[in-house]
């Protein structure tokens, strides 16, 4: 997040895209409500009439899969009506002419059928966002876990740069992560293709550096497998065992029938958790884990600020 969460209270406009803080992040939702009380306009973009849309000044109920068309049409309106921040674009961005050419063909009228949103609504949303003194965009898993995720994030951040809504108080772009300390886990390298600090596995210099730091001769040059690849890799004998910590793939992953078949074929499944999850029920070995209340730990929050939690309960697990 480029904003502190409490900055949302005093922004002039909140653009909530593919995200329902009322259900998934109640504390963030409270700050959106505070902004509303302080006079901010709220735009919610979601196919469903989600809880957060109930307090919105405008709910854009776009069709599934039409994110890019909608956002490019908003960019088209902002440029066409001369609502963009010329000084910011000239001094602090690159590629404006390329972006202009991309959105030139996305008139609001041309995307009405694609998005299910009227041209007048698209123009209204673009004007509201561009004319706000400060505007904060919030998006969540509805964006990042969608097949257009990367392109949608680029389109949202392009709107922020187009209007100068970066680098000033109460304005910014804010991807809201899905689970506790997921920011810290990713920062520490709990990803299939990076070491700590998002240093890529495929870079020989990074492999050499971490091999030296970890006291080993060398590290593999290939990246790890993504969770979505598990059924395929198990079927081809490339994965024979799984060690799962704080995750429940037999409950939450896509294509559950394929995932169940993969777990049946694994030679060894170890689950470390504080709950008897569905995945734990299918495990060969269950390791009781220590909860956050039983350990002293450092966490990284949504805003990339660190916080320390103190032990409140006696330790009863790993």
Enumerate the predicted regions with their spans.
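Cofactor-pocket helix-loop regions in the catalytic cores of large enzyme subunits
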Residues: 1-181, 185-188, 200-318
């Amino acid at each position: 997040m480029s904003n502190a969460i409490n900055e949302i209270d005093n922004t002039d406009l909140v653009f909530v895209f593919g995200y329902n803080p009322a259900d998934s992040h109640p504390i963030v939702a409270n700050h959106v409500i505070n902004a509303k009380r302080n006079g901010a306009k709220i735009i919610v973009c979601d196919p469903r009439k989600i809880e957060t849309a109930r307090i919105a000044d405008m709910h854009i109920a776009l069709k599934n899969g039409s994110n890019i068309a909608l956002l490019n049409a908003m960019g088209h309106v902002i440029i066409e009506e001369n609502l963009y921040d010329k000084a910011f674009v000239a001094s602090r961005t690159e590629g404006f002419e390329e972006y202009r050419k991309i959105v030139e063909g996305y008139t609001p009228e041309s995307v009405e059928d694609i998005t299910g949103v009227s041209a007048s609504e698209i123009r209204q949303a673009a004007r509201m966002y561009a004319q706000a003194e400060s505007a904060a965009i919030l998006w969540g898993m509805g964006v990042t876990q969608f097949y257009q995720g990367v392109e949608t994030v680029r389109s949202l951040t392009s709107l922020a740069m187009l209007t100068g809504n970066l680098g000033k108080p109460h304005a910014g772009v804010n991807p809201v992560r899905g689970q506790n300390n997921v920011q810290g886990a990713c920062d520490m390298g709990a990803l299939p293709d990076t070491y700590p600090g998002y240093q890529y596995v495929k870079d020989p210099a990074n492999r050499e550096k971490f091999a030296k730091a970890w006291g080993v001769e060398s590290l593999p040059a290939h990246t790890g497998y993504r969770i979505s690849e598990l059924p395929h890799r198990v079927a081809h004998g490339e994965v024979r065992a799984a060690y799962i910590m704080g995750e429940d793939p037999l409950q939450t992953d896509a294509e559950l029938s394929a995932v169940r078949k993969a777990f049946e074929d694994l030679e060894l499944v170890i689950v470390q958790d504080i709950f008897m999850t569905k995945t734990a029920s299918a495990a060969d070995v269950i390791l009781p884990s220590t909860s956050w209340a039983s350990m002293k730990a450092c966490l990284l929050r949504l805003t990339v600020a660190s916080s320390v939690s103190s032990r409140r309960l006696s330790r009863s697990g790993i």
